Design a protein with these regions (language model features):
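Short functional micro-motifs and their immediate structural scaffolds
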Residues: 152-153, 170
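Phosphate/anion-contacting hairpin/loop surfaces
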Residues: 1-67, 72-79, 87
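RNA substrate-recognition surfaces in RNA-acting enzymes
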Residues: 81-90, 96
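Short cysteine-rich clusters marking metal-coordination/redox-active sites
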Residues: 145-148, 165-168
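Flexible, glycine/charged-enriched surface loops at secondary-structure junctions
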Residues: 113-118
């Protein structure tokens, strides 16, 4: 039995033979999977250097890297200490590397923890994920940052609710 629940109606499901996977990613213009062996740092840095988009919006663009959604972009940027409204092309090599590495770390941890159960998400066995227990900024507006004690803020950026620490993630 296969059960698929998508309350917000964002998802689709397709069944592919393993040998068709690469062609599928290319046809859908999906970026690489955020795994060490697939997510090339130099390609990532070059893409950031060419874009004036805010880094949050750029990370949500699935052509850059596949799989990052709103929750995990907030968490990646908090860990990397980058303001979500920063222009992608202004990031230093060190900052771009931090985002790259934290993308791999956050999504790896999310998979390990079974995802984030915020409202209705459960796995195929009906079990809640536990990654939400490890969120540092997402859905933490008006709470203290665990790193510095500053109050977490929530703003709208690119039409998305965006959580960040104004002290740890300074805009400049």
């Amino acid at each position: 039995t296969l059960v698929y629940e998508d309350v917000r109606k964002f998802g689709t499901m397709e069944l592919l033979a393993p040998d068709l996977l690469e062609a599928y990613f290319i046809s859908k213009k999906l970026g690489p999977e955020p795994r060490e062996q697939d997510f090339d740092l130099q390609v990532f840095k070059n893409a950031l250097a060419k874009s004036k988009k805010p880094i949050k919006s750029h990370l949500l663009d699935q052509t850059l890297v596949a799989g990052l959604g709103n929750i995990y972009v907030d968490e990646v940027l908090w860990r990397a200490q980058i303001h979500p409204a920063r222009s992608s092309q202004t990031l230093t090599a060190v900052e771009a590397t931090a985002i790259h590495d934290q993308t791999i770390a956050v999504l790896g941890q999310a998979v390990e923890k079974g995802g984030s159960t915020i409202r209705t998400y459960t796995n195929a066995f009906g079990e809640d994920g536990t990654m939400q227990d490890f969120h540092q900024v997402y859905d933490k507006a008006d709470q203290e940052c665990v790193r510095c004690g500053t109050i977490i803020e929530k703003i709208q950026l690119g039409g998305r609710g965006t959580h960040f620490c104004p002290n740890c993630q300074r805009r400049s």
